[in-house]
A protein has these predicted regions:
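Generic protein-terminus/edge-of-domain signal
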Residues: 1-71
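Short hydrophobic/aromatic patch on the recognition helix
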Residues: 75, 232, 281-282, 286
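Short acidic-glycine-tyrosine-enriched beta hairpin
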Residues: 67-81
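A hydrophobic/aromatic-rich effector-binding and dimerization subdomain
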Residues: 91-155
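…primarily DNA-binding HTH/wHTH and HhH modules…
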Residues: 283-305
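Terminal helix-turn-helix DNA-binding modules in bacterial transcription factors
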Residues: 239-277, 299-305
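DNA-binding recognition helix and immediately preceding turn/loop
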Residues: 195-245, 263-272
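An amphipathic alpha-helical interaction segment
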Residues: 140-189, 193-200
Length: 305
């Protein structure tokens, strides 16, 4: 049966706690245990202005990002960041789902080391089919991190609170990063298939007329793989040791080398054929990767024949 969804803006920690009937102990951060919820929340869309991570222990909850369901099975972690709209739908109204997690407002991070680092945790931008599937040991560590944060915010707020809590959150986020890297490794065949498709799609892009539309982007290949750019890029880097963008750039330079060696076309023509709008951008990329300019490469190649 289809239900209409109400949109709820989560612009504060208290807004979330009131939604579920939970107590707010700190205005900028909360450790969540939905088994303590006193209100039913179902068929709603939450407009996030906060960061959140949730670990699902039970089975009866479906989350949606856009129209797509999250890969949110028992024992998985999902993460959200400001600007995301997340739907909550269950088959039955459940007053206290077995879900734990943490939610914190960006203001908590002001003047802390985490403020400048938060953007590096790319899993906040992961989408459907990209949840973290935790082992029993990883779940235990996740719980321990939450308990430490919970203990700290139970104390009266003082000048040290934000620094201590943000550092504990950073430890949790670092663990989640480690767990995702483990997941990339254990999902080896999936990862290998994605890399193979990426390499194949990259070749096809330059063998077609797509270069008339411009240079290929990481986002283009991520969409082909039905992944977010963040998850796709992290998986490719874990597999190859270099970024997806660097693989694209190296492929472009390899093709440029062949064109410069096989033809006498002006360098600007070669650049346009490869998808560059400005030849100087091509020359800059070429020199960064090879150490010499396209002109120097052509001269060196010619003198060696």
């Amino acid at each position: 049966m289809k239900h209409d969804s109400t949109i709820v803006r989560l612009d504060s920690i208290d807004a979330y706690n009131k939604l579920y009937g939970l107590e707010t102990k700190h205005p900028l951060v909360t450790v969540i245990d939905l088994t303590e919820a006193t209100k039913i929340v179902n068929h709603v869309r939450m407009d996030y202005d906060v960061y959140a991570l949730f670990l699902k222990n039970g089975a009866n909850c479906t989350l949606k990002y856009g129209r797509q369901p999250y890969d949110y099975q028992e024992g998985t972690v999902v993460s959200f960041s400001p600007g995301q709209l997340i739907g909550v739908d269950t088959d039955v109204d459940e007053i206290a789902p077995d879900v734990i997690g943490i939610m914190f407002h960006p203001d908590l991070l002001h003047r802390t080391p985490l403020a400048s680092k938060i953007k590096d945790y790319s899993f906040f931008d992961y989408s459907q089919r990209e949840a973290l599937h935790q082992s029993a040991d990883e779940r235990r560590i996740f719980n321990q991190c939450l308990e430490r944060i919970k203990e700290e915010i139970a104390h009266p707020v003082d000048k040290h609170t934000a620094e201590i809590v943000s550092s504990q959150i950073q430890v949790l986020l670092d663990y989640v990063t480690r767990f995702y890297e483990r997941q990339f490794i254990t999902r080896g065949k999936v990862k290998s298939d994605i890399l193979s498709r990426f390499e194949s799609s990259l070749k096809k892009y330059f063998e077609s007329d797509r270069t008339k539309e411009g240079l290929p982007t990481v986002n283009y290949f991520a969409e082909e793989a039905h992944l977010t750019a963040g998850y796709f890029g992290d998986m490719i880097k874990k597999e190859t040791g270099v970024t997806a963008q660097e693989i694209i750039s190296r492929h472009i330079v390899d093709r440029a080398k062949r064109r410069l060696s096989e033809s006498a076309d002006d360098i600007s023509i070669v650049a346009y054929e490869l998808g560059f709008q400005h030849p100087q951008h091509f020359s800059r990329m070429f020199k960064r990767i090879t150490g010499i300019s396209p002109t120097q490469f052509r001269e060196k190649h010619s003198s060696g024949r």
